[in-house]
Amino acid sequence: MTIYLNRQYGLGVDLIGYALTSALTIGVIFSLGFGILADKFDKKRYMLLAIIAFACGFIAIPMVHNVVLVVLLFALINCAYSVFSTVLKAWFADNLTATTKTRIFSLNYTVLNIGWTVGPPLGTLLVMQSINLPFWLAAICSAFPLVFIQVWVTRSVAASEGKNAAIWSPSVLLRDKALLWFTLSAFLASFVGGAFASCISQYVMVVADSGFAEKVVAVVLPVNAVIVVSLQYAVGRRLTAVNIRPIMTTGTVFFIAGLIGFIFSGDNLFFWGLSAAVFTIGEIIYAPGEYMLIDNIAPAGMKASYFSAQSLGWLGAAVNPLASGVILTTLPAWSLFVVLIIAIVFAWALMLKGMRITPTQQAITC
């Protein structure tokens, strides 16, 4: 998208940053409302509509010739993707057993990361042929999940139809303190891990140069992808409500160890890769863990609403590049990783605070 906005509309790096940040923020905010409404309707149909909106956004971008419309369409794409992701989690929670949920979510996260790994280089190759090819390919690829969901996904009972469902009331979200702490924890965790590649590249450009930054990113991204693809399912399947506290604590330790490793990696690419591997283990523990925490507190019939509220935590990843830039220009470069260490410790503390809260959703929704 960065290349497209630069080539088609001649936007500079600063304007592209504002445009993409605006689109991401708009997408997240609107996805919250649409995600909450998903509990009132059949989740299968909701996922199909989200995919259709996703595809329409990609089809429309090459057809319009106005940068504002492009940004709005990109916001639509992000909103549709976020809604689909949220409703998919809710469908897992509604239709799978407790022992199966984390395994399937970990498998989903693994496949998702394969897509994130393959997508950028493939998109770059397509851009070399035609600036619009990545958008057409994205629209075509979205047809596959459309067919898969239509054929193999069973209809999910809406909140109002479920026998054991709680009374659907969005105000419950505002009164659930556990949800508040878990969402704040997710915000800080995504601030630390959600945009770590761009964060590292910013850091290296300050302490070295853009050439070495490219080498570092070329090392840490494949390491991150390999660790996630190879270990995510194995780690996620072992996560249960009984052991979640010590395992999430272990994940926090891996995050901290990886960040300390980044501080002392210097110009050694091997140490950058090793630190990225340690850091990524924290990521693959936190991803299914945060899902399980929300699933455990969400009342029946309000799973999508709770996952939508938690998705606000991804704003942390959106804030990271801006915050990293401010830190790197006002403080010593190593301070960036110290701030990230403090953030993940606070994320862990807020998570524990949420775990200690006695479940109150039954009393609220009865």
What is the meaning of each model-derived region?
Residues M1-D14, S198-V217:
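Short amphipathic helix-loop junctions that connect adjacent transmembrane helices
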Residues L24-L32, W116-T117, A225-Y233, A317-L322:
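Residue-level signature of mid-helix packing/kink "hotspots" within the transmembrane helices
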Residues F30-D42, L231-I244, L328:
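Helix-to-loop junctions at the C-terminal end of transmembrane segments
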Residues R45-A60, P246-G261:
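Structural signature of the two symmetry-related core transmembrane helices
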Residues A75-L112:
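Cytoplasmic helix-loop-helix junction between adjacent transmembrane helices
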Residues P134-V151, F337-L352:
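Symmetry-related core transmembrane helices of the 12-TM Major Facilitator Superfamily/SLC fold
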Residues S156-L184:
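Juxtamembrane intracellular "pre-TM" segments in multi-pass secondary transporters
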Residues G301-T330:
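A late C-terminal transmembrane helix in Major Facilitator Superfamily
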